[in-house]
Regions:
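Basic- and aromatic-enriched surface patches that contact anionic nucleotides/nucleic acids
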Residues: 2-9, 14-22, 45-173
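N- or domain-start disorder-to-order transition segments that initiate the globular core
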Residues: 12-42
């Protein structure tokens, strides 16, 4: 394998023979409340777009969680160094974190059903709602490369790009 590039057959070989895919379910409390876990997660790798959700969209997302709506999974890539990069779901991940850390007050415009939560931050909510939020399960799909010679950063980026081009059924079908 060339040190700087991967040919399509090399990418295919890595994806078929060396790509480990794990599906996990984790509570928001475990995902964001565990200091050790939080230190490993890089939610803003250089190839991700910046956080772009406005407070109305972020509010709508938080309300969806509180109402029990199914949300798309977060997609992680575990590097050889043990860090976990968010390769899909940065907006969702960062919104979850902002809300829990008190950096997001819910807006009237973003709330469709739970209007009484207008202007509230996580810390303003009653314990029942806080527990509901923390106990909410988030689906996570985690990719990693196993049994493969060390990849360069560029090669790893090419693999991540390929992962993002899959449709969900291609991953598990």
């Amino acid at each position: 394998m060339d040190k700087f590039t991967l040919q399509s057959d090399e990418i295919e070989s890595i994806l078929k023979n060396h790509l480990k895919i794990e599906s996990k379910v984790m509570s928001i409390e475990t995902l964001l409340g565990n200091v050790r876990m939080r230190k490993k997660i890089v939610y803003d790798p250089y190839y991700q777009r910046n956080y772009v959700w406005d407070t109305d969209k972020a509010t709508y997302f938080i309300e969806s969680i509180l109402l029990g709506t199914e949300i798309p999974p977060l997609v992680f890539f575990k590097t050889e160094q043990g860090t976990i990069e968010v390769i899909d779901g940065r907006q969702r991940y960062e919104t979850l974190s902002k809300f829990l850390n008190g950096n997001l007050a819910l807006t009237k415009k973003g709330l469709t059903s739970l209007k009484s939560l207008h202007k509230q931050k996580y810390s303003d909510m009653n314990e029942k709602i806080q527990d509901l939020y923390l106990d909410t399960k988030i689906r996570i799909i985690e990719f990693s490369i196993v049994n493969e010679p060390k990849l360069t950063d560029r090669q790893e980026d090419l693999i991540k790009k390929e992962i993002l081009s899959f449709q969900p059924m291609q991953l598990f079908g």
